Amino acid sequence: MGGIFGTISKKSCVADLFYGTDYNSHLGTRRGGMATYSEDKGFVRSIHNLESSYFRSKFEPSLNKFEGCCSGIGVISDTDAQPLVMNSHLGQFAICTVSKIANMEQLEAEMLSRNMHFAEMSSGKTNTTELVALHIIQGKTFREGIENVYHHVKGSCTMLILTTDGIICAR
């Protein structure tokens, strides 16, 4: 299990993102991550291992690097290191997911047979969030890509996508 949080503000969103993501800490104990966007800084991301420490103690010392960003997503995950920052024909975006994909191995094999690759590994397995992101970028738009995910995935998948224009939520 895990939890995700997203926020957009007219001023810095860092405090809201930090506390909103931390609120989900009871849902996962493996990894925590945040990604923000601003025109000045672009995408800023941080991921920490939470297996031996709490979200707050890991992220609090480095919150200043996110300062000035007005949109962001955060995740507490019991599986994958995330959010991931991608660059594709859809533009740059950050993505985090909470999912239980029953046909993960099948989808992975299909992607590999089409000469796709996976750059992120989690405990020796393909990163689920990267698999979802690769299905999204198969679409001509984010909407088509998200529909592609739900057309192929057996199981559940909730996602937040941080773009240069805002946040897309899908479940």
Give, region by region, the residue ranges found by the protein language model.
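Conserved short alpha-helical segments that host acidic/polar catalytic motifs at enzyme active sites
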Residues: 1-171
